[in-house]
């Protein structure tokens, strides 16, 4: 917040999302907030069952390590993309979802206004991070962010993917929301760099080129509309 400094806003309420006020505001002065990278010291806020399950898994693994003196490192992956990703499951990742839509001649569907930011990291960099964590004891008993460290808006992701696939399709901004989604999420990877020597090597544009080359041999089904219908049925989007 420009007035109050660094703050930790609560999850956006359904009432706020229904009025299409996408950005979180300062809990003290009400001003619009500018997102910053999330480091590992930030309290874990679980706005969805999925998020809570990830938190519980991490805590169980770290507790197992402490209890039985077993080396455990919890890696917090951000938005992974790359070859061999499931393309016909609309819940597996936005890059795969967009690719499936484009390959079936449909425009990518984006929730909210498309300006929400995420941290996309190549599966190749994630594999390197896993190897580093297994080969070093520097981070035993810790949780570390694994991402690219470079935020990008969802609308930009759709546009770059369409260009890489030589498509003139433009993303559809649904102006709908998904309950539990955070507005922005991108990681501070300083700790992983310091403790493991982790440095992302795959630029997003290069990773997309590799993904598109692999896509040429795939025949995905576009099930995005089915996903939206399921979310609507359970009251998780509007």
Identify the residue ranges that each predicted region occupies.
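Intrinsically disordered, low-complexity acidic/proline-/asparagine-rich linker or regulatory tail/stalk regions
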Residues: 1-29, 220-238
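NAD(P)-dependent short-chain dehydrogenase/reductase
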Residues: 4, 8-17, 25-34, 49-51, ...
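C-terminal substrate-binding subdomain of Rossmann-fold SDR/epimerase-dehydratase oxidoreductases
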Residues: 31-32, 103-238
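P-loop NTPase nucleotide-binding/switch module
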Residues: 38
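A recurrent flexible, glycine/aromatic-enriched loop bordering the glycosyltransferase active site
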Residues: 41-45
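Short amphipathic alpha-helical "recognition" segments used for binding
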Residues: 58, 62, 234-237
């Amino acid at each position: 917040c420009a007035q109050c400094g660094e703050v930790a806003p609560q999850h956006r309420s359904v009432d706020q999302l229904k009025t299409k006020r996408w950005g979180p505001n300062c809990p003290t002065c009400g001003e619009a907030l500018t997102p910053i990278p999330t480091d590992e010291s930030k309290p874990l806020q679980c706005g969805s069952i999925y998020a809570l399950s990830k938190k519980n898994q991490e805590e169980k693994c770290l507790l197992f390590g402490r209890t039985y003196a077993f080396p455990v490192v919890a890696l917090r992956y951000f938005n992974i993309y790359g070859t061999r990703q499931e393309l016909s499951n609309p819940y597996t990742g936005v890059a795969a979802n967009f690719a499936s839509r484009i390959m079936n001649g449909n425009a990518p569907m984006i929730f909210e206004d498309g300006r929400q930011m995420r941290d996309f990291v190549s599966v190749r960099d994630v594999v390197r991070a896993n190897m580093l964590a297994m080969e070093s004891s520097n981070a035993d008993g810790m949780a570390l962010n694994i991402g690219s460290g470079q935020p990008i808006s969802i609308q930009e992701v759709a546009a770059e993917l369409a260009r890489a696939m030589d498509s003139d399709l433009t993303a559809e901004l649904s102006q709908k929301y998904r309950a539990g989604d955070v507005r922005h999420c991108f990681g501070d990877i300083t700790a992983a760099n310091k403790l493991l020597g982790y440095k992302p090597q795959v630029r997003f544009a290069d990773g997309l080129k590799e993904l598109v080359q692999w896509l040429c041999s795939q025949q995905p089904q576009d099930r995005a509309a089915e996903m939206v219908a399921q979310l609507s049925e359970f009251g998780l989007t509007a």
